[in-house]
Each structure stands twice: as structure tokens, then as C-alpha cells.
From Swiss-Prot:
Keywords: Cap snatching, Eukaryotic host gene expression shutoff by virus, Eukaryotic host transcription shutoff by virus, Host gene expression shutoff by virus, Host nucleus, Host-virus interaction, Inhibition of host RNA polymerase II by virus, mRNA capping, mRNA processing, Viral transcription, Virion. GO terms for molecular function: RNA binding; RNA-directed RNA polymerase activity. This is Polymerase basic protein 2. InterPro entries: Flu_PB2_2nd, Flu_PB2_6th, Flu_PB2_C, Flu_PB2_CAP-bd, Flu_PB2_middle, Flu_PB2_N, INV_PB2, PB2_helical. One of its GO terms (biological process) is symbiont-mediated suppression of host gene expression. The record marks E627 as: Avian adaptation. Pfam families: Flu_PB2_1st (PF20947), Flu_PB2_2nd (PF20948), Flu_PB2_3rd (PF20949), Flu_PB2_4th (PF20950), Flu_PB2_5th (PF00604), Flu_PB2_6th (PF20951), Flu_PB2_7th (PF20952). Belongs to the influenza viruses PB2 family. Gene3D superfamilies: Polymerase Basic Protein 2, C-terminal domain. The lineage of its organism: Viruses, Riboviria, Orthornavirae, Negarnaviricota, Polyploviricotina.
């Protein structure tokens, strides 16, 4: 106060004011500070005094021909004096206005393409809905979040190569575009940005926004997907929140969400198979999410979630060093421990063999709805500070911490036998047994834990065994805090190993993850997940089995049709047709199979009755063990949508619809893919299928020996000719192609030539 008073007195004297306002700044240090280096030291001030001048802008001399000296109001737009020290003209800010209104216009077609992320953000905000503002204490915790909606997931290096290739294609320097996403993006962007007049550097910056995930460690209460983070400043303050529903979704959030669902489903399915690790890898490699291979997404996507991390570990990728227990992510922040096997008795006198952690340790625990700080020593909880959204979430965190502490009173609180099993009907390990037991009912645990009087500490209150808050007493060592505990910020990744039962360990042998930790929560994926592995088809019920079976046939049609003609039994026994059998009513399964197999045999025998769409449609029915009967069917029943639906043997139905015009197949209203050939080529097509790689030269020529069967064709060498027996005893002369490039057109030409050769 004294100093301020003194200053006021000084300022009231006119001499002081004069010294301060009129004296030149001639102190060398000050002059140095403001004049050394190219960096502007006070940009705001510089801008203010520059704009106060009449001609603060310099421009190329050509501007004098492009802009009049005065505008409509008679104000001068540029000065005849040259800019000191350069060959440029001094220009007024009014010239900018004139240029914007009357200057030449260029095509704006590229702007929405280059500034795509901004245009999309405006759309999202336009269609978003902002709800009421609520005033309440915000429990924010810092989380690593994605701040850049609408990006691909390329690494910085991959993006750099794409940007160089798109924006500066003629620059020297090695660029290797290897991944599928790199190639697709490069091709797409080159087409979009043809003849683009926007400054290349700007285009490069904007491309970077589109290609690379940018994460920040920010305090968040609520949604963490990028479409919420972009409006974080509008939706949550220190003591208020505003409800907001985004006006659109972005692909990167959808990928993150769909990846988690796919990974959870795959881990759950792998757990019950004979070799979980091998099955998991097979499924990861054969699954596509939104049209991208799941393994490619796993390599690039930094999402940390238990199931996703198990899949990454299986692929040999590094993952975060934190471990998971009871749905919480634990990160040790100090201390250390050694592990020792110990046997203990539960309250029910059941013996448990537990790996005890000996030593003092501190952990942060972060879950979706609660966070905590835990201090513990050998089999004793010293302190647990927990914060959460509601009573339920806080209770969940307390149970997990109490079990993790391995305290004797927790083990003695067990009532009844522990015999929880996993999906594969194997007993859970003791720690998860205890966890499941208390998650079902923690009353005895809380009652036996003990309570203690508490001191009045700012921002902390106690919690009683019935989970009600209190300012006097609390569960021993447990306090509830208003402040959240930040997520572990480091993005460090460590090398891990995984065993065949999908338990993930760090290099010291500590278990970081196991299938027990995978959440049961089931959402609906935002992007289409295609599990090509037939192990996964049943996951989404009968409809999914139906769609996936037909998609598999279409994808593998080339091989399927050859097997259909040459080795049908092998085809009928394919594992991919197994899930489909559960849809066919048990009573008619073998009758359908016998009927379809007979029908197929007739098609093979009678030339020209081959109908691709019909074979695809009926093939799955032929997989059941057949019953030889004379029964004919005009439609076959499948059990989907809770009732029997009919597939017509000839013609379309809601279940199976082939559109001749678009050549696309729709199963239960879902697109199942396109047929690459026209089924109506009356495709004497089995022959044409089998004769891929052969040229049909005409009618039989006896010089080339007796007619071979289709199966014997494989013996021919390139360029060799032979007579072949096709269909019902017709013989044509063929030659094995010398090169493979034109194989694609063979099936169409073969069909036409067979007809010509026979007629």
C-alpha cells in the first residue's frame, strides 16, 4: 500500500508525468531488447500503431495497375512514395476493402476441399443442440483426448510422405507410400486438388490436420470423443456445464468406438476356443472395421482399452505399462514390491492361494466413472482417496481397492464358496474370485472393514459402510474427495508378452491384462464390422449369420465355383457353412440338403442351366448331411427375426434379393456385395469358370488325342492344346494360355466360344 501511495504522489507532479511521457527511450538495453532479432517483441502494440498509420501495408508495384488511386468515396488507396528500403508501394487498408469488393474473383471450388475440417466443424455446430446450463461442482480429470475431429490415423511420418507426394510431387526425396490408407488418401487428394490455387504451404497444414491424430492432456468431465472436445470451452467451466449434443459424428470417433466393440467381441469369442491366442489372431487378421483391416487400425490407433490392448499385445505391438484390475487402470506412481505365494482362509474356510505384493506402493486408479489414489503396504490399505460421479461409482472403486489391498479382513468377509468361472468354464484366479464375490454384494466387506473418526480437511469428507457421506466418521483409510485424480499422462509404450490364454505380462512378469478384465458392456458399433472369420458370425445373432455366410460365398466365389463343379463334397463340408445350419429348422435340414444337392447335380449335367445367383442362394443349405428323398421345394425356410422366413428357390424374396441391373445382392435388406459376372450369361459357366486360363479354339480336333475331362486339364503346360469334354458329352479344343494377364475375361469369352464351338 505504501508503495502505491508513493507512486500516486509522484504521478501527481507534472514533472514526473513529463519525464515518463516525453523522454526518449535511449537506454541501450531497451533499444537492444526491441530491435535485436527478427522476432516481434510486442505484436499487439506493433499492429495497433501500424494500423494507425495511413499506409501500413506494402505491395508489389503491379498493384498500381490493378487498383485505382482513389475509391468511390475519393479516399486514396495507395501512395506514390516508395517503401523505404524496398521496391514496393505503400498501400492503405482501404485498398484491401476495395480488392475484396471489386478485385478479380478466382474459383472457390477447392476451398471446401482444402479447409474440409473447418467446413465440417461449422456443419456439426450448426446442427448441434445446446441444452440448459447447470451450475454444479465439476469433477474434472485430465485425460488424453483427441482434439482434432475428422482425421485419418496416419503416423506423423506416413502423413509427411503423403503430404509431400500430394503438395510437392516434384520435390526430390525418398517417399515410400506403403500402407493401403496412404495410397488411397494420396490418390483421392491428388484428384481433389487438381489445379488448386491455394498456397501449397496452407494445403500442407490443412492436410496434416486431416491425416494425423492430435492428442492433448486436458481436464474433462463428460464426453471424451473428439466432437465433444472441440466444444469443451462451451460445455464445461469450473462450476457449470452446458448440455450439448453434437450435430454429426466423425469417422475417427466412430473407428475408436467400433474398434473397442470388435476387440471385446473377439477376445470373448477367443476365450472359449481351444487355442485362444491363435483364434484371436485369426479373427483380428480377418476382421474389417468400416472397410479397413482391423490389424491396420490396431497398428495406428492409440486407443487404450483392455480388449484393444490384448489384441495389440497378441500382434506384438507395444502397449501402456499400466495394468488393469476390476475395470480400473492402475499406474504405480511410487514404491515397489516383491511377489510371494501365500495361502489364506476365507470366512468360509476355503483355502485361497494368492500372490501377495510385499512392500509399500502408491497407485492412481482411473475408471470411466470414478478415480482414486491408493497407498498400500503388504496386505494393508493405508489410504484411499476416491472421487466419482455418484455413490454407485464411488462404491465400485472402494471395492476394487479393498480387494487389491489383499487385507485379511477382506478375505475373512467372504461368505459362501468362491466358484466363479469364465466363459470357457474355467475357474477364475483367486483375486478375480474375490472381486466378483464382493461386486455381487459388498455389505459384509464394508461392515467388517472398520471405521475411524476423521479430521476436517478441505475438500475431503468421510464415507460410511452404507455409502452415505459423513463429516465425522469414515471407513478406515478411505476418504471421498471433490477433486478427480488425473489419468496417467505419459504415452510411453512397453514391450509385453502374451500367453495362449491371453494373459499379458510386462518384462518383469507382472500381469497387466487378462480376459477377465474385458468389459461386458455391449454397445452398437457405429461402423460396419465384418468378421470374416466364421467364428464370429454368431455374435450378432441369426441375421448376422445369414448376411455373413452369403458375403463369404461372394468374396470367395472364384474358388467356390470351381469346387462346386469339381469337388462339391469338399465344398459342402466347409467350416464356414456351420453357423448357417442353426438357422435351418432341424426337421427339414437334411431334406433341404438332399433336394439342393440333387438340383446342383442336374445343373452340372445340363449345359447352360448354371445360374450364379441361384447357386449362391442355395449353397448353404447343401451343407447339412443329405437325406435322399424325392421331395421338391419351391421355398426354403430360415429362422431369423424370431420367425421362419422364406427363401424362394427361384426368384427373389426379402431374405435374398439379387438385383440384375446393379448386380448387387441384398440379404435381409443389407447389401451383401456384388457379383463380378453376370449370372444371366446362362453361364455354361461352370465350364467357363474351370476354363479360366484356357483359350477355346473351336470344335474337337482329333490330332490332339482323346478328350480329357475338365479335372485333367491342370496337367497341360502353357501353350499346349487338348480336346476337353464338357457338360453333356460335348468336346471342344482348348489351349492353355501362355500368360495370365487376360484370365479375367476368359469366363465371358469362354461361354460364348463354347456355344459357338458346339453349335
Amino acid at each position: 500500500m505504501e508503495r502505491i501511495k508513493e507512486l500516486r504522489d509522484l504521478m501527481s507532479q507534472s514533472r514526473t508525468r513529463e519525464i515518463l511521457t516525453k523522454t526518449t527511450v535511449d537506454h541501450m538495453a531497451i533499444i537492444k531488447k526491441y530491435t535485436s532479432g527478427r522476432q516481434e517483441k510486442n505484436p499487439a502494440l506493433r499492429m495497433k500503431w501500424m494500423m494507425a498509420m495511413k499506409y501500413p501495408i506494402t505491395a508489389d508495384k503491379r498493384i498500381m495497375e490493378m487498383i485505382p488511386e482513389r475509391n468511390e468515396q475519393g479516399q486514396t488507396l495507395w501512395s506514390k512514395t516508395n517503401d523505404a528500403g524496398s521496391d514496393r508501394v505503400m498501400v492503405s487498408p482501404l485498398a484491401v476493402t476495395w480488392w475484396n469488393r471489386n478485385g478479380p474473383t478466382t474459383s472457390t471450388i477447392h476451398y471446401p476441399k482444402v479447409y474440409k475440417t473447418y467446413f465440417e466443424k461449422v456443419e456439426r455446430l450448426k446442427h448441434g443442440t445446446f441444452g440448459p446450463v447447470h451450475f454444479r461442482n465439476q469433477v474434472k480429470i485430465r485425460r488424453r483426448v483427441d482434439v482434432n475431429p475428422g482425421h485419418a490415423d496416419l503416423s506423423a511420418k506416413e502423413a509427411q510422405d503423403v503430404i509431400m507426394e500430394v503438395v510437392f510431387p516434384n520435390e526430390v526425396g525418398a517417399r515410400i507410400l506403403t500402407s493401403e490408407s496412404q495410397l488411397t488418401i494420396t490418390k483421392e487428394k491428388k484428384e481433389e486438388l487438381q489445379d488448386c490455387k491455394i498456397a501449397p504451404l496452407m494445403v500442407a497444414y490443412m492436410l496434416e490436420r486431416e491425416l494425423v491424430r492430435k492428442t492433448r492432456f486436458l481436464p474433462v468431465a463428460g464426453g471424451t470423443s473428439s466432437v465433444y472436445i472441440e466444444v469443451l470451452h462451451l460445455t464445461q467451466g469450473t462450476c457449470w456445464e452446458q448440455m450439448y449434443t453434437p450435430g454429426g459424428e466423425v469417422r475417427n470417433d466412430d473407428i475408436d468406438q467400433s474398434l473397442i466393440i470388435a476387440a471385446r467381441n473377439i477376445v470373448k469369442r477367443a476365450t472359449v476356443s481351444a487355442d485362444p491366442l491363435a483364434s484371436l489372431l485369426e479373427m483380428c487378421h480377418s476382421t474389417q472395421i468400416g472397410g479397413i483391416r482391423m490389424v491396420d487400425i490396431l497398428k495406428q490407433n492409440p486407443t487404450e482399452e483392455q480388449a484393444v490392448d490384448i489384441c495389440k499385445a497378441a500382434m506384438g505391438l507395444r502397449i501402456s505399462s499400466s495394468f488393469s484390475f476390476g475395470g480400473f487402470t492402475f499406474k504405480r506412481t511410487s514404491g515397489s514390491s516383491v511377489k510371494r505365494e501365500e495361502e489364506m482362509l476365507t470366512g468360509n474356510l476355503q483355502t485361497l492361494k494368492i500372490r501377495v505384493h510385499e512392500g509399500y506402493e502408491e497407485f492412481t486408479m482411473v475408471g470411466r466413472r470414478a478415480t482414486a489414489i491408493l497407498r498400500k503396504t503388504t496386505r494393508r490399505l493405508i489410504q484411499l482417496i476416491v472421487s466419482g460421479r455418484d455413490e454407485q461409482s464411488i462404491a465400485e472403486a472402494i471395492i476394487v481397492a479393498m480387494v487389491f489391498s489383499q487385507e485379511d479382513c477382506m478375505i475373512k468377509a467372504v461368505r459362501g464358496d468362491l466358484n466363479f468361472v469364465n466363459r470357457a468354464n474355467q475357474r477364475l484366479n483367486p483375486m478375480h474370485q474375490l472381486l466378483r464375490h464382493f461386486q455381487k454384494d459388498a455389505k459384509v466387506l464394508f461392515q467388517n472393514w472398520g471405521i475411524e473418526p476423521i479430521d476436517n480437511v478441505m475438500g475431503m469428507i468421510g464415507i460410511l459402510p452404507d455409502m452415505t457421506p459423513s463429516t465425522e466418521m469414515s471407513l478406515r483409510g478411505v476418504r471421498v474427495s471433490k477433486m478427480g485424480v488425473d489419468e496417467y499422462s505419459s504415452t510411453e509404450r512397453v514391450v509385453v508378452s502374451i500367453d495362449r490364454f491371453l494373459r499379458v505380462r510386462d518384462q518383469r512378469g507382472n500381469i497387466l491384462l487378462s480376459p477377465e478384465e474385458v468389459s461386458e458392456t455391449q454397445g452398437t458399433e457405429k461402423l460396419t464390422i465384418i468378421y470374416s472369420s466364421s467364428m464370429m458370425w454368431e455374435i450378432n445373432g441369426p441375421e448376422s449369420v445369414l448376411v455373413n455366410t452369403y458375403q463369404w460365398i461372394i468374396r470367395n466365389w472364384e474358388i467356390v465355383k470351381i469346387q462346386w463343379s469339381q469337388d462339391p463334397t469338399m465344398l459342402y463340408n466347409k467350416i464356414e457353412f456351420e453357423p448357417f445350419q442353426s438357422l435351418v429348422p432341424r426337421a427339414t435340414r437334411s431334406q433341404y440338403s438332399g433336394f439342393v444337392r440333387t438340383l446342383f447335380q442336374q445343373m452340372r449335367d445340363v449345359l447352360g442351366t448354371f445360374d450364379t445367383a441361384q447357386i449362391i442362394k442355395l449353397l448353404p443349405f447343401a451343407a447339412a448331411p443329405p437325406e435322399q428323398s424325392r421331395m421338391q421345394f419351391s421355398s426354403l425356410t430360415v429362422n431369423v427375426r424370431g420367425s421362419g422366413m422364406r427363401i424362394l428357390v427361384r426368384g427373389n424374396s426379402p431374405v435374398f434379393n439379387y438385383n440384375k441391373a446393379t448386380k448387387r445382392l441384398t440379404v435381409l435388406g443389407k447389401d451383401a456385395g456384388a457379383l463380378t459376372e453376370d449370372p444371366d450369361e446362362g453361364t455354361a459357366g461352370v465350364e467357363s469358370a474351370v476354363l479360366r486360363g484356357f483359350l477355346i479354339l473351336g470344335k474337337e480336333n482329333k490330332r490332339y488325342g482323346p478328350a480329357l475331362s475338365i479335372n485333367e486339364l491342370s496337367k497341360l503346360t502353357k501353350g499346349e492344346k487338348a480336346n476337353v469334354l464338357i457338360g453333356q458329352g460335348d468336346v471342344v479344343l482348348v489351349m492353355k494360355r501362355k500368360r495370365d494377364s487376360s484370365i479375367l475375361t476368359d469366363s465371358q469369352t469362354a461361354t460364348k466360344r463354347i456355344r459357338m464351338a458346339i453349335n
